[in-house]
Amino acid sequence: TGSFIFTGTGNQTYTIDPAAIRSPNIVVRKGTGTVSASATTNWSIRSLTISQGSFDAPTGTLNLNFNFSNSGVFNHNNGNVTFAGTTTQTIGGTSVTSFFDINNNNAANVSLLQNCSIVNDLTFTNGRFVINARRLFLGVNTTITASSSTRYIQSNGLSSGLGVEKSFAAGTANFTFPIGTAARYTPVNYNITANGAPGSINIQPVTGAHPSTTVAANTQ
């Protein structure tokens, strides 16, 4: 497996042969300019590192077998990023990345090292989406597909964690946060029957009793 490193100041377009056996590492290290994926091609690569500059994702599916790191600009192009590795994959970098669709297809989990947002859909095919102490932003129209007691958003279980923040439009809404800790799945459902203005709800499960607990057995 080799690496393709994009430098310079102009715009560049790169096409990956879908029949290629080896998946490369893509590194974007540009002072100015954008690296664009072929819009009609589904990519399968080992890793994507945006150290500097911009990367335009394919409008189809970007399959990643290793890590994603963004310290520049990632333009999702309404495409899907599928994490399909066999060891834990990370989403890191210094930029807060906005994804359109994410397919969590890694039994060893996907782990957040930086805050990120999902605009359209988070699909659980395999494994958990581990946010650690980071924040996951979900947009007004974001949906979550195929979550379960073994496939869910996992927080660090501490009150210092930032949790999951979901935006809601004015009006009614019904949404389930498929969230929990490493030890327990504790989904939360909100049925909003009246909402006069747009807003957001933040959920962070905590392992342990609430400090105001008055029942000795912590059964409430």
Residue ranges, per PLM feature:
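Extracellular beta-sheet-rich ligand-binding/adhesion modules
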Residues: 1-220
